[in-house]
């Protein structure tokens, strides 16, 4: 098999899984949004943001660490699985104490299991196995999520989603049998792991804090519209996300893929144009209850360009060189600008201010990555 054919085959394995899983998830959330309306959808999103925050902190950066070290055949899986599982259980119990919602607590554990297993599989370049689990989880999410909704109403959605993650436990058990627990590795790799932990905190803050701020600031109806727009943005992000998952392990083992990176960045420009024009019209036509989402999508679609530049060009380079502190600083820049933007621009311009702050924030993160990359080229 030629080099490019092999690349296309591997990318297709990841791509089919991510396209199908994102498509299934989007249909699921569109159905839920249409059924329960903007306010209830905003409330569900708010609770999921809490689960995202708790699981992100509990991961301790293990997902990024696993993807790199599994690719480099460093046997750290069992150690990270054990440590993360303990912290995850503590987080789940703490959240249950405050919210008394078993579904919410189980989702925290589910998020952790999914992140650990998929990161390890991608690092090992087991793309077919990755595809199988990702698609299976989304199918189960639809079956259980909708099924439990009609039994328990809104709380049933969270419980159903949480149950969809547990088939992945099989892979966790398999890794425990294959590798010995060795805490010395954590000490040896502490700087890289710590930077990944910091990155995980920032990534979690980026994906959840905006929703936790918007809810008390502008209400659950606005949050519901914003969350639906982000669901559409996630669909737009499928291609760069797939390529990033392919490139990171490749870059870690010395394959640059520069031509592929340039092609994907150019494609992202076309995606941004289509999202800003046709996408915004489509969402208001499909779900008229969420007409405010049209304005958000028109703006946030342009964020796909800086997301792609960072995701497929800069971040894989930083990870491969174990210079992930620059990803930490880039993400810090993004999170700081976005929070400031939501509080200031959101208060002044409402939904438009929130949307524009996202684009500015992600662009700010890319600016930092550009400067850091130039610095590394000059002094390395």
Q: What is the predicted role of each segment?
A:
Residues 9-21, 46-100, 253-276, 330:
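Membrane-water interface segments that mark the loop-to-transmembrane alpha-helix transition
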Residues 1-3, 7, 102-106, 124, ...:
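Interhelical loop/hinge segments that connect adjacent transmembrane helices in multipass membrane
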Residues 27-53, 192, 196, 212-234, ...:
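Interfacial/gating helices of multi-pass transporter permease domains
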Residues 21-25, 29, 47-67, 104-122, ...:
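Short runs within selected transmembrane alpha-helices of multi-pass transporters and secretion channels
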Residues 35-47, 72-84, 88-111, 150-158, ...:
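Membrane-interface helix-capping segments at transmembrane helix termini in multi-pass transporters
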Residues 69-83, 188, 225-301, 305-315, ...:
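Specific pore-lining/lateral-gate transmembrane helices of multi-pass inner-membrane transport
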Residues 35-38, 124, 151, 217-220, ...:
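Helix-loop interface residues and adjacent transmembrane-helix termini in multi-pass membrane transporters
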Residues 14, 41, 77-80, 104, ...:
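Alpha-helical transmembrane segments and their helix-entry boundary regions
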């Amino acid at each position: 098999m030629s080099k490019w054919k092999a690349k296309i085959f591997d990318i297709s394995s990841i791509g089919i899984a991510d396209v199908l899983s994102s498509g299934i998830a989007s249909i699921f959330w569109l159905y839920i949004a249409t059924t329960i309306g903007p306010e209830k959808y905003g409330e569900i999103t708010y609770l999921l943001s809490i689960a995202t925050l708790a699981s992100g902190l509990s991961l301790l950066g293990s997902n990024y660490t696993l993807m790199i070290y599994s690719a480099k055949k460093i046997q750290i899986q069992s150690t990270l699985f054990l440590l993360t599982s303990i912290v995850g259980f503590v987080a789940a119990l703490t959240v249950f104490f405050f919210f008394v919602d078993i579904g919410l607590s189980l989702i925290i554990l589910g998020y952790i299991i999914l992140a650990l297993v998929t990161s390890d599989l991608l690092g090992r370049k087991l793309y077919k196995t990755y595809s199988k689990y990702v698609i299976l989880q989304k199918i189960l999410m639809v079956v259980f999520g909708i099924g439990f909704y009609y039994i328990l109403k809104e709380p049933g959605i969270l419980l159903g989603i949480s149950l969809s993650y547990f088939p992945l436990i099989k892979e966790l058990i398999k890794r425990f049998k294959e590798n010995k627990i060795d805490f010395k590795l954590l000490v040896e790799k502490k700087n890289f792991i710590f930077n990944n932990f910091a990155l995980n905190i920032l990534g979690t803050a980026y994906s959840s804090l905006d929703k936790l701020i918007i809810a008390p600031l502008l209400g659950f109806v606005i949050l519901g519209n914003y969350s639906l727009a982000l669901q559409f943005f996630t669909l737009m992000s499928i291609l760069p996300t797939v390529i990033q998952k392919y490139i990171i392990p490749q870059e870690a083992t010395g394959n640059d893929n520069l031509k592929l990176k340039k092609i994907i960045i150019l494609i992202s420009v076309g995606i941004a144009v289509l999202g800003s024009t046709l996408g915004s019209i489509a969402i208001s036509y499909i779900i008229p209850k969420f007409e405010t989402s049209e304005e958000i999508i028109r703006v946030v679609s342009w964020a796909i360009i800086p997301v792609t530049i960072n995701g497929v060009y800069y971040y894989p380079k930083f990870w491969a060189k174990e210079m992930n502190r620059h990803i930490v600083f880039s993400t810090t820049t993004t999170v700081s600008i976005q929070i400031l933007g939501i509080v200031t621009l959101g208060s002044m311009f409402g939904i438009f201010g929130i949307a524009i702050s996202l684009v500015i924030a992600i662009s700010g993160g890319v600016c930092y990555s550009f400067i850091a990359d130039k610095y590394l080229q000059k002094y390395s």
